[in-house]
């Protein structure tokens, strides 16, 4: 059984965290430990038709945002890694500087120091120099920065299609297969020698 910690912050894009939880719930070998930040509850209410309690029901273990005595606040509690989706710029900055003012940042700090996979899904646009500097620093520390950027080669027909692809890329970081994934497999019927570079 693999334990994966999921943090959901108050940044817009609550559906990313919700869909990630739904997909993880379908994995019989994964135990999900969830933390919703204070503002995540508000964002979930504003952006989805779910309540915070509905979202918590998708996890195996749920912690309060300020529960610093939680199991996931210690490196001796073994987990396979952590995802923060969506990840606010405040949370990102806190993780970069080691300022763990809540359980999400503390669990991320532990994940980094234990050299376990930490996947951050930053939600902000445009990005300032501060945001970019924080992401670069965290990437150098070993965190995986997975911005929720859509792919268009799979011809998404809905927001759901876009979210599905982004969540697939998040799950890829843990080698968790997605049956619904629409992956790039090259140009159908084309040979490499026939492809030409076109300058616009």
Residue ranges: model-predicted function:
Residues 1-119, 125-200:
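A cross-family phosphate/adenosyl-ligand binding-site feature
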């Amino acid at each position: 059984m693999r334990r994966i910690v999921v943090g959901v912050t108050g940044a817009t894009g609550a559906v990313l965290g919700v869909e990630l939880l739904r997909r993880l719930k379908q994995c019989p070998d994964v135990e999900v430990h969830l933390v919703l930040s204070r503002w995540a509850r508000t964002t979930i209410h504003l952006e989805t038709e779910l309540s915070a309690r509905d979202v918590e029901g998708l996890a195996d273990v749920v912690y309060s945002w300020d529960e610093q005595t939680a199991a996931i606040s210690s490196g001796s509690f073994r987990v396979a890694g952590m995802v923060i989706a969506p990840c606010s710029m405040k949370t990102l900055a806190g993780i970069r500087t080691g300022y763990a003012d809540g359980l999400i940042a503390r669990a991320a700090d532990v994940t980094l120091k234990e050299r376990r996979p930490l996947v951050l899904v930053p939600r902000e646009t445009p990005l300032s120099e501060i945001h970019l500097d924080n992401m670069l620093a965290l990437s150098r520390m070993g965190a995986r920065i997975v911005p929720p950027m859509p792919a268009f080669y799979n011809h998404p027909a809905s927001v759901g299609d876009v979210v599905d692809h982004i969540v697939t890329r998040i799950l890829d970081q843990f080698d968790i297969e997605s049956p619904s994934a629409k992956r790039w497999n090259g140009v159908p019927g084309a040979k490499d020698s026939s492809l030409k570079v076109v300058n616009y």
